[in-house]
Amino acid sequence: MYRENTKEIAIGNVKIGGTHPVTIQSMTNTKTENVKETVDQILRLEAAGCEIIRCAVPTMEAAEALKEIKKQIHIPLVADIHFDYRLAIAAIENGADKIRINPGNIGSEEKVQAVVDKAKEYNVPIRVGVNSGSLEKHILEKYNGVTAEGIVESALDKVHMIEKMGYDNLVVSIKSSDVLMCVKAHELIAKACPYPLHVGITESVSYTHLT
């Protein structure tokens, strides 16, 4: 199988991209503020082979909980941020090994710049995440709806914004609940930028739910 030679990125003590093997990441479904429940779930995931863990950070209390969670686990911790740039900054300050943001819902470029500056200070990678359900109006109009090309254009716009801010410690995530569209989008973006890709399917459900 052909593989793009992407930029090497360090997430804590785990390296991705370049010639490194694909790593397995999962996400907790606990309230991150509940340190014990979150740690217990992460340790079970570690035992099952998880190599990187992501936690939702919807509140400042959750951001502050990352510091204690980090002390009790053995794999890199990623903070999943939506809407409030201050949570991204707090997550980095409390030990997140990587943050996931969608610059399109963080707010103004000044707010994105504040997050980038903090990531630079701590040398923390940023995962730029875009999904098919959050495409900008002008992209939807240009491509007459949701398309792989539109998803890629939206993601590249955000990547280029952060590059212009002087930061390239990046991972890119593009997601769609349409599997074939998702595959095509990944093929397109792999040729368009040098960063490693986080591969996942949005709106995923359990097997028991499907049956």
Regions found by a protein language model. Name each.
Residues 203-205:
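Active-site phosphate/pyrophosphate-binding segments
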Residues 3, 27-29:
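N-terminal capping/lid subdomain adjacent to the active-site entrance of alpha/beta enzymes
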Residues 208-211:
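Conserved small/polar residues in nucleotide/adenosyl-binding loops
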Residues 2-14:
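N-terminal basic/disordered segments at the start of proteins
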Residues 70-79, 193-201:
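Short beta-strand/loop segments at the ligand-binding rim of alpha/beta enzyme cores
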Residues 11, 16-23, 30-55, 60, ...:
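Alpha/beta enzyme core
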